[in-house]
Amino acid sequence: MGQKVHPTGFRLGTTKTWDTRWFADRNYADLLLEDIKIRAWLKKRLAHASVSKIVIERPAQKARINIHTARPGIIIGKKGGDIEKLKNDIKAITSSEVQINIVEIRKPEADAQLVAENVAQQLERRVAFRRSMKRAVTSAMRLGAEGIRINCAGRLGGAEIARTEWYREGRVPLHTLRADIDYGFAEAHTTYGIIGVKVWVYKGMLIEKK
């Protein structure tokens, strides 16, 4: 059976970049563990804020955290009160000085991670998986995606035997390195078990053919 390589890992260093951007010598492991803790804590804390990705940079004893979200108002709060509280809570995890930047996602319907989380939430609310997949695909294509593929795997519809169902519209060239492929994964925790949702969104070519 053909296995799918992670589209972001496959393109690192060519058309994609890392979500953790810093260099370290001896304390590399400590900083990496800090990053993992910060990411896990933020994902839990901002579960309802439509967070797509968290990019961490560390310039000179600082930790600059860029949160990519579709709902910046929820994170910032009234007069920036919530973001200050967030900053103080993160200071308990890291020894560095914390700076938080909020990056707004203009088209959440075409962001692979947010689409995957949206489909997973619908599956948890017992919406029919085919309907939620179809709705997500239609929305992404309407907002300018050139192609999208959604995979749902698990006990779909409460079936005894787990299976994989997928739906695709447009083209999704996974082997073309210059193709801008956005990938997202989420889990739906249903009463029957966990359903995995994978989303690939093709947004066009980054480098045109010479």
Curated annotation (Swiss-Prot):
GO MF annotations, alphabetized: mRNA binding; rRNA binding; structural constituent of ribosome
Annotated ranges, domain KH type-2: 38-106
GO BP: any one term: translation
Membrane-crossing residue ranges in chain numbering: none
Alphabetical list of NCBIfam families matching this protein: rpsC_bact
Record's GO cellular component terms: cytosolic small ribosomal subunit
Job of this protein: Binds the lower part of the 30S subunit head. Binds mRNA in the 70S ribosome, positioning it for translation.
Alphabetical list of SMART domains matching this protein: KH
SUPFAM superfamilies named among the record's database cross-references: Prokaryotic type KH domain (KH-domain type II), Ribosomal protein S3 C-terminal domain
Protein name: Small ribosomal subunit protein uS3
PROSITE patterns referenced in this protein's UniProt entry, alphabetically: KH_TYPE_2 (PS50823), RIBOSOMAL_S3 (PS00548)
Keywords in alphabetical order: Ribonucleoprotein, Ribosomal protein, RNA-binding, rRNA-binding
